[in-house]
Amino acid sequence: MNISENTHIVSAFGPQAGGSAIAGDYINLKNASHVTVLVEVAQGNATTVALTLEQATAVAGTGSKAITEAVPIYLVADADTSDVWVRQTNAVSYTTSAALKTKLVAFDVDVDTLDTNNGFDCLCVKAAASNAANILAAQYIVTGERYHNV
């Protein structure tokens, strides 16, 4: 599989300190079937990082609300020494441990889990404020697009 031809990768937010809350850009999933929200946490302080997903009716964040249907979550607890993904309990959010490790967290979201009946087809990842020594970055990896949204 050629990742650049079979997926659409979009930056949610670039690397930044977690001393303040971080909100990723909203992505329109109207013509997609699935998105993996990938968050990298370089944890430099023993403060947990709370991650959430919100849905909206437009990429401006119109009517934003938390997702309500639990989605599969995967974790690499120490990405500096391992590349093994471990399935976590399905949930609508995830909070990291306080361990000083580089972590990868993936939310697997089928677009059907969004409130599409009420027009919610946009998604955003958010990180609550933790500590400035915690550096975070996130991407959306979209699959199953009928055609690319611009």
Per-region residue spans from a language model:
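Surface-exposed, low-hydrophobicity beta-strand/loop segments enriched in small/polar/acidic residues
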Residues: 1-150
